[in-house]
Swiss-Prot record:
Name of a matching Pfam family: Condensin2nSMC
Keywords: Cell cycle, Cell division, DNA condensation, Mitosis, Nucleus
Localization in the cell: Nucleus
GO BP annotations listed: cell division; chromosome condensation; mitotic sister chromatid segregation
Gene Ontology cellular component list: condensin complex; nucleus
Gene: ncapg2
Organism: Xenopus laevis
Name listed for the protein in its UniProt record: Condensin-2 complex subunit G2
Length: 1156
């Protein structure tokens, strides 16, 4: 039996297994059986017989297992009945798959003589069941889709329905996450089938949803075939265009900006192929809508740049047929109106589009009308440059530069000159806006890209040279960027635009962003890396002579533009130059070492013969020119600093560089005695190990020892830095400790001196200088780190020595002739402050070891309570000097404690003790000078306490908060009492406490939810102070003419003015303050005509706005209700003060509550 006959018999209903075996053989690439070849061999009658059998096989399989049972195939079940049913369904799926493959293969053998009605029916059945197939049978869905595609492509009977089925399947597949590019290509291949769908029919609803999803699919938007397909969808129906545009607009914010060009391309393709109503709809409903939004969207809207991107794409297509005319027609009702709009942002947006689309013209206009249209648009450009809004003027500058750069040859010279004169003459010096000035220099590089503009700009730009000194940094940055552009395009010599002395003057003083750009501008001029090293040195000297400070700045950033190798070469070349200068001065002394001809370190420097330079430098430099010598040494320091990391990574090069400079450093110290030369030499020495410069390293400590007290910081700073870099900071501390110990009271000095062997030195001790050294070390981070890295024993010894100053301070508080010392008051106070500061640095360093050093500060607080405060509290008359000393000690201690609180080192125990000291200080009533610092401390403790309570509700802070409230209350009482007794001093005190008091109130207000008790207590204290003071001032009025209600806070008495100034800064504080005032009035805690009037004055000054806030009205209403109870006062004599106050208050209340 032949294969043909066997296959035909297998398609019978009783031979399903044989049929499936044939299908399996067909799918097996390695088997020679090919269904396509077999079908080619069949006669017309056999083909028809085969298709009949396939139809019968398919229908009987579907009848045996109808669609309703198919979903069970995906369900896992152990039920025997369901397992058997699932097995039957799987068999049916195999039959469907086999029939589909056979039907698809049959399409190749259909010709005009064959009747394929049966095959059509079979394909129709398959097409009908495709959507009911289980998800697990995706391979059958794919086979049916291929069948439908092939049917449609062959153009057989019923192709429209099969095409629609294939289209829907491909459309859904293309929207899947795992979609492949080929699916989108196939979808485009079937795009004509969309026209078979009736847009208004029910079946098209699902199609519409899927099609609209395509416009949100990145795969469709990015692929060429996808964009073709999407642009084709515009032609389906006019109403669908609006749906497409609405979908894109709604999702525009979610789409990345990078896709906007593709989105615009879709619109453009659709527009290009459209005609009639479709064209009109695309233009008016889509493109013109984008134009409208491009003009009216706020500039800060995330959609604005995306809409601009879409419109820019259309502007770029102006040379394409019909685009220019389309833009002219669509912009006509939008852009000209936008340019005249009242809203400056709308004008600016319209200007941006106008500039991009320029010229907006209809190519169909005649020559005369075209000229008029262009002239009108140039007039609009001039109008933009004269707009009152800086944003619009900036846009106008951008527009002029873009347009003139693009159309330079076509614009009349007179207009070009006028435009540039307007920009460079007026707007570059626009005093009202730095943004406009900045835009001028940012946009000029656009114009410089056109070489034709260079001659005119070369003549006009020198007038702008002083713009380099603009007070706005961004303008200066833009100006230098413009000079860089001029240099890059070779439009002119940049130093002719802006003279070199101006550029260097700016480099000397300007910020990093400007300086780095200037260095970039000047780099090739002063560091020509393509020339010999001697030339580099010559340029360096020339730069020094032009501007030494600018030279240092230049070489500070030079490393950014060249390799470390070149920097090192320049350092060594300068070294040779300095050596040559010294040799000419002292010809008999050879400052050169024998190693100068040796090889260099790997990759950094190369050896050069150390012979005297025979160059122009000999005629310029001399050791007598100390300024130039110092500048060269400073530049070596700057250069070395810039490549320290590179040298650290190349040990051989580092060693070579150190050896070169170490060999000549002693001669440099001999030759260059001036202080300005000595400083860089010391810094150079600090870059080397001390063993490399033994003579100098042994003399550093001696230099520090022999300095006079009161020496300037610059005399010892570099020496101390040097020792710190060498790890010898301990020597400085030993010297400082020695001087301090010798200056303290004699009994202590003798006791300490017995414990150590010391070289006899007849020099007197210098405690002030010792403190200068210690303070310098502690103030600078690098030095402080070196200090704290010492052994704990040495640090404790320093702390102990500094702590002995308390005995000196006690001597000033309670003078005694029995004790002598050599420390003045200022020095003692500095030592005390450094003692407290050092204890905190040590606590931070060794925090993991407990609170040892924090307890030191607590002990100091105990000393203040036991020794300092009793002196202030005593009723004995003490002189002004001890009292001032007590105040200064308190200030120094509280300042350090405030810093401890701020950096988070204070635990609850420390806070409690500090709060106790604060209360003690306030209760003395003689420490008003300390009140500003006390308020700062209260603020910090309050913030820590409330934050802790807020984060952990179980924390008990009530005692602490009560103490804070008590301290605050006492502080305000002290201020009020001071105002009554010594008003002039108190007024100065109010100025100093306003800032810390405001910070305290702000903290309490911000954390009011953490402690309502503290919040209310603070507000009631402030309120009582204000009401009492204003009432007191009203009570002192003797003449009715003096009764003037306050119109602002400045009209209030001093304390009230201070408090209300703080309150009105925060709307929430005003609201809380007035609520507290209203409650006090309601509870009759504020009563009487004068007190209620004082409360009214508070309400009046609390509102800055014309519209009276609800909180102010509530307070006014409460005052009105209580004040009415005193109406009998109107029966008093007309000259009565209380009556006048009452009537004045009622008038104010009537105006507030019943405005006309």
């Amino acid at each position: 039996m032949s294969k043909r006959e066997a296959f035909l018999q297998a398609t019978a209903k009783d031979s399903v297994e044989d049929f499936l075996s044939f299908i399996q053989l067909h799918k097996d690439v390695s088997d020679p059986f090919d269904l396509n070849e077999l079908l080619q061999e069949l006669s017309r009658k056999q083909k028809e017989e085969l298709w009949e059998k396939l139809k019968t096989l398919l229908t009987e399989a579907l009848v045996a297992n109808p669609v309703e049972r198919w979903q069970n195939i995906d369900d896992d079940s152990d039920d025997d009945m369901e397992v058997e049913s699932s097995s039957d369904v799987k068999q049916t799926m195999c039959v469907i798959h086999g029939v589909t493959i056979a039907a698809a293969a049959s399409l190749c053998v259909i010709d005009e003589d064959v009747c394929y009605e049966t095959l059509l029916e079979c394909a129709a059945i398959l097409s009908g069941i495709v959507h009911a197939l289980p998800k697990s049978e995706s391979h059958i869905t794919l086979a049916i889709r291929h069948l439908c595609e092939a049917w449609w492509e062959k153009g057989l009977q019923g192709k429209e329905e099969f095409g629609k089925t294939a289209f829907l399947l491909l459309l859904a597949k293309s929207l899947e996450v795992k979609c492949v590019v080929a699916d989108i290509g196939r979808l485009w291949h079937l795009h004509q089938t969309l026209l078979s769908f009736d847009f208004n029919s029910e079946e098209s609803h699902n199609v519409k949803d899927l099609l609209l999803q395509c416009f949100l699919s990145i795969n469709h938007i990015k692929k060429e075939e996808g964009r073709r397909f999407l642009s084709f969808l515009f032609s389906w129906d006019v109403n669908f265009i609006k749906m497409i545009h609405g979908t894109i607009k709604n999702q525009l914010q979610c789409l990345p900006k990078s896709l906007m060009t593709h989105i615009a391309d879709i619109y453009f393709r659709a527009w290009k192929k459209a005609s009639g109503d479709v064209l009109q709809t695309i233009e008016q409903s889509c493109i013109q809508d984008f134009m409208h939004h491009g003009v009216h969207l706020p500039r800060n809207s995330p959609l604005h740049p995306k809409v601009r991107e879409v419109l820019s794409y259309f502007h770029q297509q102006k040379l394409r047929q019909g685009v220019e005319e389309m833009l002219y027609n669509l912009y006509q009702p939008i852009i000209w109106r936008g340019l005249k709009a009242r809203n400056s942002e709308v004008r600016s947006n319209a200007a941006l589009l106008f500039v991009e689309a320029f010229p907006i013209r209809d190519p169909n206009l005649n020559h005369e009308d075209m000229d008029n249209e262009i002239q009108k648009q140039f007039e609009e450009l001039f109008n933009l440059l004269e707009d009152p809004q800086p944003l619009v003027r900036s846009t106008g500058v951008l527009g002029v530069c873009k347009i003139t750069a693009k159309y330079w040859e076509m614009i009349p010279p007179a207009i070009l000159t006028d435009l540039l004169r307007k920009i460079l003459g007026d707007l570059a010096a626009d005093v009202s806006s730095a943004d406009v000035r900045c835009s001028v220099f940012k946009c000029l590089p656009i114009l410089l890209d056109n070489k034709l503009s260079h001659p005119l700009l070369e003549n006009m730009l020198p007038a702008l040279k002083f713009c380099l000194h603009d007070n706005s940094e961004k303008v200066r940055v833009a100006f230098v960027d413009m000079l860089l552009k001029i240099k890059a395009v070779r439009a002119a010599k940049f130093w002719k635009i802006c003279p070199m002395e101006q550029i260097l003057a700016r480099l000397e003083v300007d910020s990093r962003p400007v300086s780095r750009r200037i260095v970039n501008l000047l780099f090739n001029s002063f560091f020509p890396v393509n020339q010999q090293e001697e030339v580099w040195c010559e340029r360096c000297v020339a730069l020094i002579q032009m501007n030494p400070a600018a030279a240092r700045k230049f070489y500070q950033y030079a490393y950014e533009h060249t390799a470390p190798t070149n920097i090192a070469k320049l350092m060594l070349t300068i070294r040779r130059c300095l050596n040559a200068c010294i040799n000419r001065t002292v010809p008999n002394e050879d400052t050169e070492d024998e190693d100068d001809d040796e090889g260099d370190g790997e990759g950094i420097v190369r050896g050069d013969s150390e012979k005297e330079n025979k160059s122009v430098l000999e005629n310029v430099l001399s050791t007598e020119d100390s300024a130039s010598m110092a500048s060269l040494l400073e530049i070596v320091v700057v250069l070395w600093r810039s490549i320290r990391k590179a040298l650290d990574q190349n040990e051989e090069a580092k060693t070579y560089t150190i050896s070169k400079f170490a060999s000549v450093l002693p001669e440099y110290f001999k030759a260059f005695k001036e202080e300005r030369c000595t400083v860089p030499l010391i810094i150079l020495a600090s870059f080397m190990p001390p063993a490399a410069v033994p003579t100098f390293s042994c003399s550093v400590l001696s230099k520090l020892r022999h300095l006079d007290s009161g020496a300037d910081e610059q005399k010892y700073s570099t020496l101390i830095d040097c020792l710190c870099r060498w790890g010898q900071v301990g020597h400085v501390l030993e010297l400082a400790s020695e001087w301090l110990s010798e200056s303290y009271p004699e009994k202590r000095g003798r006791k300490d001196s017995n414990r150590q062997v010391r070289i006899q030195d007849t020099m007197e001790s210098k405690p002030a200088l010792a403190l200068d050294y210690i303070e310098y070390i502690m103030t600078h981070t690098m030095n402080r780190d070196c200090l704290l890295s010492l052994q704990t024993k040495k640090l404790n010894q320093l702390l102990k020595v500094l702590g002995l100053v308390k005995e000196v301070l006690f001597c000033y508080i309670k003078p005694s002739e029995a004790v002598t010392h050599n420390v003045n008051q200022d020095t003692a106070l500095r030592a005390f402050s450094l003692y407290c500061r050092l204890s905190i640095h040590l606590q931070h360093k060794f925090s993991s070891e407990g609170r040892t050093y924090l307890s030191v500060l607590e002990d100091t607080g105990g000393w203040i309570e036991s020794q300092v405060l009793p002196t202030l509290e005593s009723n004995q008359d003490i002189s002004e000097e001890p009292r001032n000393m007590c105040h200064q000690i308190l200030k120094a201690y509280l300042t350090v404690c405030k810093d401890v609180l701020m950096v988070g080192l204070a635990d609850s125990e420390f806070q409690a003790q500090l709060l106790q000291i604060t209360l003690s200080v306030i209760q003395t009533e003689k420490c008003h000078n300390c009140l500003p610092m006390l308020f700062y401390v209260l603020k910090e403790i309050t913030e820590l306490c409330l934050a802790h309570k807020m984060s952990d509700a179980s924390v008990e802070c009530d005692e602490m908060l009560d103490a804070i409230q008590k301290a605050f209350h006492k502080s305000l009482e002290t201020v009020a009492r001071r105002l009554r007794k010594q008003r002039e001093e108190a007024l100065q005190l109010l100025q100093t406490i306003q800032l810390p008091l405001g910070e305290f109130v702000h903290t309490v207000q911000c954390w009011h939810t953490a402690s309502k008790v503290l919040h209310r207590g603070t507000l009631s204290t402030l309120l009582a102070a204000v009401v009492v003071e204003i009432s007191h001032s009203l009570r002192k009025i003797t003449d009715l003419s003096e009764l003037t209600p306050p119109s602002s806070i400045s009209d209030l008495p001093p304390l009230s003015k201070c408090i209300m100034t703080i309150i009105v800064k925060s709307p929430s504080a005003v609201s809380s303050f007035l609520d507290e005032l209203t409650e006090c009035i309601t509870l009759e805690e504020v009563e009487g005509i004068l007190s209620l009037t004082a409360a009214l004055y508070v309400a009046v000054v609390s509102s800055k706005r014309k519209q009276i806030p609800p909180a102010v009205k509530n307070t006014a209403s409460a005052i009105y209700r209580k004040l009415k109870n005193f109406c009998e006062v109107t029966m008093d004599d007309a000259g009565s003060i209380e009556r006048a106050v009452y009537e004045s208050s009622m008038r104010i209340l009537n105006e507030m509550l019943h405005p006309s």
